UniProtKB/Swiss-Prot annotation:
The record marks 325 as: Important for acyl-CoA specificity. Signal peptide: none annotated. Belongs to the AB hydrolase superfamily. MetX family. Transfers a succinyl group from succinyl-CoA to L-homoserine, forming succinyl-L-homoserine. It comes from Pseudomonas syringae pv. tomato (strain ATCC BAA-871 / DC3000). Keywords: Acyltransferase, Amino-acid biosynthesis, Cytoplasm, Methionine biosynthesis, Transferase. The keyword Transferase applies. InterPro entries: AB_hydrolase_1, AB_hydrolase_fold, HAT_MetX-like. It comes from the Bacteria. This is Homoserine O-succinyltransferase.
Amino acid sequence: MPTVFPHDSVGLVTPQTAHFSEPLALACGRSLPAYDLIYETYGQLNAARSNAVLICHALSGHHHAAGFHSADDRKPGWWDSCIGPGKPIDTDKFFVVSLNNLGGCNGSTGPSSIDPDTGKPFGANFPVVTVEDWVNSQARLADVLNIDTWAAVIGGSLGGMQALQWTISYPDRVRHCLAIASAPKLSAQNIAFNEVARQAILTDPEFHGGSFQERGVIPKRGLMLARMVGHITYLSDDSMGEKFGRGLKSEKLNYDFHSVEFQVESYLRYQGEEFSGRFDANTYLLMTKALDYFDPAANFNDDLAKTFANATARFCVMSFTTDWRFSPARSRELVDALMAARKDVCYLEIDAPQGHDAFLIPIPRYLQAFGNYMNRISL
């Protein structure tokens, strides 16, 4: 528990909340009459307001990307390895904004928020939101912060999809787009994994049609299973083999179905247990649907190059060799389309054994490449 923070940490940070009273029309046909977005900022906005960077989070992410909320925090924000003084997203240079998206469960308006029309939690009645909806809400946050143009919009996985959508929805408001371990749309296999996770939640007896909060329960087993399935896809076979192999928790097998015998079983159960205690089941459903629905080329006759025709940003696309959830082939597909659209794009394929989660890990080669790109951004 740090009492003196590392020299390259942003230190103590305090979340802020922006309230929006203007209705937000959503892709599903519904609207949110009012909503809150919780966010954090790191660094200082320069006089020209030209150094702002937006961080977009992935499925289970949130606004707390860097620093500490108190001296007693055991861990910093989820992307602390990349945000801070002298780090790839250098807070001595950039003013960084990180938010929790609509539908989240960490302070922004979402399923666990109170529906003003009923006085009860929204639950499953919270509208389905899309990546495009998120970007529209993020643009309103930029307006509140008086940021006309982002120096960069950055995200990994689902966050990378949001960064890409920014260049489509608001082409004149983003100068650099960094899409890391991402894809222009999900594959059938990815959609299938998301559906298995959703069914684990939806069929949990404690889900109660999404109204579990009113009953004072949570669909713990469903959330655990959803997280366990998801977590397997975030790791590579090599990294799991190196970390666990066929190691046992004890010296002998129990020959039953209830004991936790293999180390990898113990790890997955721990991950599921921990996740089910901090994440909202309805939010998980929403996030997976946002992933499934992201397909911007569908509005351009499935022509990915035409999709980015109006983009003015420079692009940096990064992938990891052992990521099979968002494979390098999907990033190369994106790069090919951007090149066909005659956009300024660089592509980095990083040799890393950690799988999809590599974008969250301080891998030296990754941090160096990331930092080199960010250092070249002029303000």
